[in-house]
């Protein structure tokens, strides 16, 4: 039997979706299908062709096509969902939730129809609630529907720590628990630089400031851009997760997954440390938490639940 490349579909060809597609192609993780709505079919095809024409220069082998027809995504191994609207000025979070939930339901229906055996990674915000929506709508087992936020939040945390210590980001490890928002829980106790606990290297007030900046990391970029939100780091985070699955790397990465009793919570999607490999979420890693950390996680969970209440 002929060996075939993996097929990865990216739903939503905006800044994040297009950047994700480009990174996945550069990493040669598979052939890429970039999908958007019919009104945007030509720009989507244009972006895909532009990326493809960079392949001789950058030296990667991957086919990249743009489309508005989900039939082109048939038999995808992995589907990444970035589609959805961004929150506009004056728009309530509830409005954002209901609009994006409708989009998730439509997208999921098409994905399941054409790629019933795929793994789905969700980026659309509010990501905890949207991951839950896709999980319920797809009927897929929980290991195959994964939300991305922790890799991004941890990347921001690691960036700020590396800047503070003036060291390589490669030497900084960290973990962020909970929902993707102001109540996320960066676990400083489980964070290191070159194997040394951060608490031994950075004064508490500076560490607290880094935690606070991490929580507000998305907002900081929104404010600086003035229009739109972050897309380079979110796309890089998605690419890292896709690579872990495609190459069966069994990486320890924070991911949003469906909890069934872990950390004392049940029936909800929340960011926790996981092992991510060829079978999607292979395992949830349960860390021992202090009372303060438990309280912070409970607060984060409440924020997620408040969003979930809006779901139809």
Swiss-Prot record:
Catalysed conversion reaction: (S)-malate + NAD(+) = oxaloacetate + NADH + H(+)
EC number: 1.1.1.37
Disulfide bonds: none
Sites bearing Phosphoserine, chain numbering: 149
List of residues binding substrate: 87, 93, 125, 156
Classification via InterPro entries: L-lactate/malate_DH, Lactate/malate_DH_C, Lactate/malate_DH_N, Lactate_DH/Glyco_Ohase_4_C, Malate_DH_type3, NAD(P)-bd_dom_sf
Active-site residues per Swiss-Prot or TrEMBL entry: 180 (proton acceptor)
Listed transmembrane segments: none
Keywords per UniProt: NAD, Oxidoreductase, Phosphoprotein, Tricarboxylic acid cycle
Top-level enzyme category: oxidoreductase
Residues binding NAD(+), per UniProt: 12-17, 36, 100, 123-125
Superkingdom of origin organism: Bacteria
Protein's GO biological process: lactate metabolic process; tricarboxylic acid cycle
Gene Ontology MF: a single term: L-lactate dehydrogenase activity
Similarity annotation: Belongs to the LDH/MDH superfamily. MDH type 3 family.
Task performed by this protein: Catalyzes the reversible oxidation of malate to oxaloacetate.
Protein name per the record: Malate dehydrogenase
